[in-house]
Amino acid sequence: MRNRQNQKNWTNLRGLLSVEEREKLENLRLELVCMQAANSIPHDPPEISSLETELICLTTNTKDCKPVRFHSDLLLKKHKYNEIKKIFKEILENIEAYRDEFTKNQTKINLLLADDARASLRNRSLDFSDLMPSSIIKDVQVLANMEANVVVMKNALKTKLVGEKSVPVASSPISSIIPRTSRNKKTSPSNYHHSVLSHRKSNEWNQVSSTEYKRTLLLNIKYNDDFKATIVPSFESCLCSRSYFLRVKLHFDKGVGSAEIDIPVQVKNSFI
């Protein structure tokens, strides 16, 4: 139990949130756009065979304050993040190699300095930090050693497509359209984030030009009360951060494949 002062402080903090931030996320509208290639034969857009949502947890931590803020798309895509991290590790290795080489030849380098260079140093020796500031080296070290951990919570949410007929994954008639990666997973009527979509006019593709189609999907999202894991509220500090994303996956028929989008969401403790 919180004492009265803590309750008052918590109430004041909640009062700083905007009306939108205090509202629960219950409905999500998605605007889909399908563009046909200019050199392809005109055809109807592929239909959505199944849909699923996942709650994504992203945790970052560093040994010192981060000098820059990375876009979430870079941190969520492991291959992109590893590429950036590799670049900074290579930069750090080069800096350390240059510093070692400078240290070995520091006396010779100082003998080669011109008079105006000596004057600017006020008769002290040239150090490597004069060429590469310590603050820059520190920033590179932080970025080269930053860690990002992504956890996918598949059963944290229950999602329904508003205005469409939804069928649980456990039903046998739809086993043929479930993506191969999902067929070996256990399913039950409560796990209905996979849905087969009927062809209602309200959610059909609408042609807006000769090569462009648009479609609107409205998702009803609820937290799964049967989900047992502890979800820490979103936060961000100098050394560590925790953020969440709602990942929506759309699987299309006709062998087109799938598409996904990660939508930033905030997890807050609204209880006093």
UniProtKB/Swiss-Prot annotation:
Classification via InterPro entries: Bul1-like (IPR039634), Bul1_C (IPR022794)
Name the UniProt record assigns to this protein: Uncharacterized protein YNR068C
Species annotation: Saccharomyces cerevisiae (strain ATCC 204508 / S288c)
